[in-house]
Each structure stands twice: as structure tokens, then as C-alpha cells.
Amino acid sequence: MSTRNSRSELEKTAVQLFRKLGTRTVLFHQAAAQALGLFPTDLKSADILNEAGPMTAGELGKKTGLSTGSVTALVDRLEKAGYVAREKDPNDRRRVVIVPLTASKKHIKDLFRPLSESTMDLCREYTEEELELIFSFVGKAADIMEEELERLKQ
């Protein structure tokens, strides 16, 4: 097999593995949401809030692609479950921001702990240099996914 074919096969394998990982990730988060009594979109929206910090419902709608009405219902559910709070924006009292509260929820940490521990165990199989390369690759792949997400939203 020539280097070109070998490289091409490796690239195809990368695409297949990322598809597999993406599918397993979606299925895992669906199961996690169900275990928490949430819809998958609710759980991922709470995750977006944890990652990005407090934001308005409109900003959350832009990030998720959900309509205003859907975001309102989603925030209502998350607030009722104790995963977010609506607070007045300290910089503009006319605005309300959605504040994540999930980081302090022990049962969420407990739910994700085995996955975190398994991931850390996997990391221990690689050298620091290998991990830096892996993280660079995965980070760039995440950037590509973000770009493709934005493209699909247009």
C-alpha cells in the first residue's frame, strides 16, 4: 500500500471514529438526562450555561438554535428542577440572565464521575507529549465542529 493510500485510510478511520464517538456521546447524554429527569436538550443547555456562564434567554436561544418559546419552557424546567436561576443582570437591571446552578449539584457530579475517572485512566496510558498532541487534535476537531454548527445555523 502506498503512503497516499495509507494516509487516506487513516483519515477515513479518523472520520469514522469521530462519528462513533459523537454517536456514543449523544446516547450517553440522553441516558444521563433521563437519569436526571431531564430532556437531553435541557441537560446540554445547562452544560452550555456552565461552560459559558450566565447569559440571557436570547443568548441561550442563539447558542442552542431553539426558539424563544422553547427556551422559555426549557429555562422554566431547569429552574423548577433547581439547575438554573433567573437573576437580574447586575450591569443592566432591565435584563434577566440565566445563572447555572448545576456545578454545585452532587448528584450530577456523581453521575458523571465514572466517565471522568475512566477518561483520566485513559490519559494515564499516554505520555505528556502524546497527550498534548491528542488534545491539540481534539481541540481543533472541536473548533471544526463549532464552525460546522454555525454553518448549519445559517
UniProtKB/Swiss-Prot annotation:
Residues covered by the HTH marR-type domain: 7-143
Keywords on record: DNA-binding, Transcription, Transcription regulation
CDD domains for this protein: HTH_ARSR (cd00090)
Transcription regulation keyword on record: yes
GO MF terms, alphabetically ordered: DNA binding; DNA-binding transcription factor activity
This protein's record includes keyword Protease: no
Protein name from the UniProt record: Uncharacterized HTH-type transcriptional regulator YcgE
